[in-house]
Amino acid sequence: MSLHIADHPLVKHKLGLMRQNDISTKDFRALASEIARLLTYEAVKDLPTEKHIVDGWAGPVEVDRLKGKKITIVPILRAGLGMMDGVIDLIPSAKVTVVGFYRDEETLEPVEYYVKTASEMSERVALIIDPMLATGGTLIATIDTLKKAGSKKIKGLFLVAAPEGIKKVQDAHPDVEIYVAAVDERLNEAGYILPGLGDAGDKIFGTR
């Protein structure tokens, strides 16, 4: 697995604002979208292009166009929806695949409750988006689901990640690339990232 940690002053500044405990829902939501946009820019640098001839103002001109099927964005419900706008801003023609999991209270393992994939998944780059990569369990389950649907190239975009989760995903799916704004210190006993952002879903949807 390739791990890409954003090294950009704008990302660091915006993430710092998100760490404030008294941040408003409006600001948290806006910053999540803005960082998602910046992470997307990095994550799609290797997309293939092909040459096309178009009618320019002074005659025919050769231009680059993206090659192949459109990307599919994969928000993990519910918090992943908070990063959607930032990704869609850059890739407005992207298809959307939606996955949802809940945690079994006895086994603590993720249980799939909703999946709706785009068509021809084997021909699309899949961009998983979720604010937090904590234990890695939900991400691994999501990757498993996408691979069963035919996905061959998968990338994940996260605001913050814990070393424990990164290691777990790396062991399970070494072919998946991870793009993250920051790698934090550790997980606490309850599985929350420290220092982290708190409950990103609650902050995005105003349900805290």
Swiss-Prot record:
Gene3D superfamilies: 3.40.50.2020
Description of how activity is regulated: Allosterically activated by GTP.
Catalytically driven reaction(s): UMP + diphosphate = 5-phospho-alpha-D-ribose 1-diphosphate + uracil
EC code: 2.4.2.9
Alphabetic keyword roster: Allosteric enzyme, Glycosyltransferase, GTP-binding, Magnesium, Nucleotide-binding, Transferase
Binding locations of 5-phospho-alpha-D-ribose 1-diphosphate: 78, 103, 130-138, 199
Cofactor remark: Binds 1 Mg(2+) ion per subunit. The magnesium is bound as Mg-PRPP.
MF terms in GO: GTP binding; magnesium ion binding; uracil phosphoribosyltransferase activity
Segment forming the signal sequence: none
HAMAP family: Upp_B (MF_01218_B)
Protein name: Uracil phosphoribosyltransferase
Species: Desulfotalea psychrophila (strain LSv54 / DSM 12343)
Lineage, highest ranks first: Bacteria, Pseudomonadati, Thermodesulfobacteriota, Desulfobulbia, Desulfobulbales
